[in-house]
Amino acid sequence: MNLLFIGGGNMATALIGGLLAGKSSIQRLHVIEPNTEAQEKLQSRFAATMRANGVEFSFHGAEAPASFAQDAASSWVVLAVKPQHMKEACAQATGPARAVLEKGLVLSIAAGVSIATIAGWLNNTRVVRGMPNTPALVSQGVTGLCAHASVSPQARAQAEALMASVGRVVWVDQEPLMDAVTALSGSGPAYVFRFVEALTAAGEQLGLSHAQSMLLSVHTLKGALALLESSGEPPAVLREKVTSKGGTTAAALASLDRDEFMQMIEKALTAARDRSAEMSREFR
């Protein structure tokens, strides 16, 4: 597999690391990244591993090696830049990079940029749209994927393997559902972090130190999620097992219900979904 990254930031770094750790069959890998500090970080982190694995690699500010032009149709380009910079990054690509963008397979991991928009910029419909999340940085991410109808089953499998290197993958058949994916899992880590903030602050108000409250909050979430995943039981069943009639958990849950906790979460996700759809219109 030949891989060309446009953008060498955190998500590109996570993907490269995951692919190398998974012993993926990469023949060539190049990153177009104008920031010299980012180039140096990539070089420092991955050069030795790539040499050991026999991967032809390079990091450059503007151009891809000529070898990519020879196999453009079978190469992948990963668009790993911020959505507001995507159009400019595509327009500035020249030579072999332009050949891969126009003839190869394209995986975009930018929020809010539709498949049709990318296909229009590149005159290439072989586009897969992905929405990863930040836990991919520790190989615990989850990515929603959606592909143009012209993307072959083999190419879909390759795109899935790319994103599975940093976590789990969920396919959606209708692109508007990518806005829901963005709202739920793309933005989801921020909701979890806010919840931990709230738990920690509340624990401090009840007399615990910040360190105690943070440790209790983080490990309660980690343990509860591990139990949920390993038990195979629905979250409602596990919740009921913790909740004794007239007990402390019942009192806390009743307070959450009075404050319409479930409706609050639904409203938050709807707001994120609507903003994602709005961004898709802005980036046309």
Predicted regions and their residues:
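Short pre-catalytic strand/loop immediately N-terminal to key active-site residues, enriched for Gly-Thr
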Residues: 177-183, 235-240
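Rossmann-like NAD(P)(H) cofactor-binding subdomain of soluble oxidoreductases
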Residues: 36, 40-42, 46, 63-145
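NAD(P)-dependent Rossmann-like dehydrogenase/reductase catalytic/cofactor-binding core
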Residues: 218-284
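Small-residue helix-packing motif on alpha-helices
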Residues: 29, 39, 209-216, 238
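NAD(P)+-binding Rossmann beta1-loop-alpha1 motif at the extreme N-terminus of oxidoreductases
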Residues: 1-69, 76, 141, 204-206
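Internal alpha-helical scaffold of NAD(P)-dependent oxidoreductase catalytic cores
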Residues: 117-126, 142-180, 192-230, 275
